[in-house]
C-alpha cells in the first residue's frame, strides 16, 4: 500500500513539474514569435513622432498655444515628439 501511494505521489509530482516546464517553454516561444519585426516597430515610431510634431506645428501656426496631441499605446508627447512612457 505504501509503495503504491509513494508511486502515485511521485508520478503526480513529476507530472506537475513537467507541465510547468512545458508551459514556461510555450510562453517563451510565444513571446519570441509575437511582436513586429524591428523594421515595422521603427516605422510605427516614426509615424508617432511625425503625427505628434505635425499636430503641434499646426497649432503653433494658428497662433494657439501648443497643446500637445496625446499619443496612444504607452506613448506621450514631449518636446514635439512622441516618447515611450
Swiss-Prot record:
The keyword Magnesium does not apply. One of its GO terms (cellular component) is host cell postsynaptic membrane. Keywords: Disulfide bond, Neurotoxin, Postsynaptic neurotoxin, Secreted, Signal, Toxin. Disulfide bonds join 52-66, 56-77, 71-82. Residues 1-22 form the signal peptide. Expressed by the venom gland. Monomer. PROSITE patterns: HWTX_2. InterPro entries: Hwtx-2-like. It comes from Cyriopagopus hainanus. It is found in: Secreted. The keyword Metal-binding does not apply. Neurotoxin active on both insects and mammals. GO terms for molecular function: toxin activity. This is U4-theraphotoxin-Hhn1a. Residues 23-48 form a propeptide. Belongs to the neurotoxin 12 (Hwtx-2) family. 02 (Hwtx-2) subfamily.
Amino acid at each position: 500500500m505504501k509503495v503504491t501511494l509513494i508511486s502515485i505521489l511521485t508520478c503526480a509530482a513529476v507530472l506537475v513539474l513537467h507541465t510547468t516546464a512545458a508551459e514556461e517553454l510555450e510562453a517563451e516561444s510565444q513571446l519570441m514569435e509575437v511582436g513586429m519585426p524591428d523594421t515595422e516597430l521603427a516605422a510605427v515610431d516614426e509615424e508617432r513622432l511625425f503625427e505628434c510634431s505635425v499636430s503641434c506645428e499646426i497649432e503653433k501656426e494658428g497662433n494657439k498655444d501648443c497643446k500637445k496631441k496625446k499619443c496612444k499605446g504607452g506613448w506621450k508627447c514631449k518636446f514635439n515628439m512622441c516618447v515611450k512612457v
